[in-house]
Amino acid sequence: MESVADLDPEWPIEKRARSGPQPRPVPCLLTLSPPPALAHVPAMAPVSQHLGPYVLLEPKEDGRAYRALHRPTGTEYTCKVYPASEAQAVLEPYSRLPPHDHVARPAQVLLGTELLYAFFCRTHGDMHSLVRSRGRVPEPEAALLFRQMAAALAHCHQHGLVLRDLKLRRFVFTNRERTKLVLENLEDACVLTGPDDLLWDKQACPAYVGPEILSSQASYSGKPADVWSLGVALFTMLAGHYPFQGSEPALLFGKIRRGAFALPAGLSAPARCLVRCLLRREPAERLMATGILLHPWLQGDPRPTALSRSHLGDADQVVPDGAGLEEEGDSGEVCLYS
């Protein structure tokens, strides 16, 4: 299993505020409503065991879930296992959200005396793996996929969920053709108790963390921070590498604080515009999640067009094609914000 020490940009980190005492627990973590009714089953070891109509098979690659077979139908599921004591916290985000085409939810939940078993539909890889294996995603395909990602985030924000740890790896494919995405792992989300989305817990993945989370301020607004992370995801899809890279965390975080990145050559003007609308250093200047869906790049044919140099300003300098997702370097960058 990867760790923060390995500098994996997809692995979460936790950063405490550097000044002032920590306030009381964030309101989003307070109990709201009861979770859905659970089926009670005996406690048992999770591997190679029968569990109601399911049989649990080997662990999945990440070691946090298991393949499961629904015996009556032969359908394969993913089973996530949690301590039974965490049932309320795990299920609360799912009970808050109405069903949505691009947000995963448990097909069935079984509660034992010690363990909670949540069964999700089988997936076929995730966006991080797709970009890592293929590099840049062509604009038409990227727009098709990103529209689904933005719709999932907008649905969560509209119903009082802040994701905090948004990244490509959390968007998984539900079909073999890899054309339909759902957002998973909502159990990590903050459930807001009102319109205020102010958060104090600074938790994110290094490559996706917003500049406001790296500041010395004790709190930050959760929804714009999610939008920044979604902007990082979009840039990575279109460029094949992260917008902010550094061989050490201090270098990476310095670039994020400055908002320094360079868009790749060959992108259409609407695509470039959308990336810049999401990766704004000031949270209040970013698009809201619902506004992303109204952007021209997601409304029509996003085929790349040749850009005239007259359309390129200092904020539009480009880097050569071919950089991989794991490649790092300092060349070709320009600070987008003063």
Where on the chain are the PLM-derived regions?
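Terminal C-lobe "cap" of eukaryotic-type protein kinase domains
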Residues: 280-285, 291-305
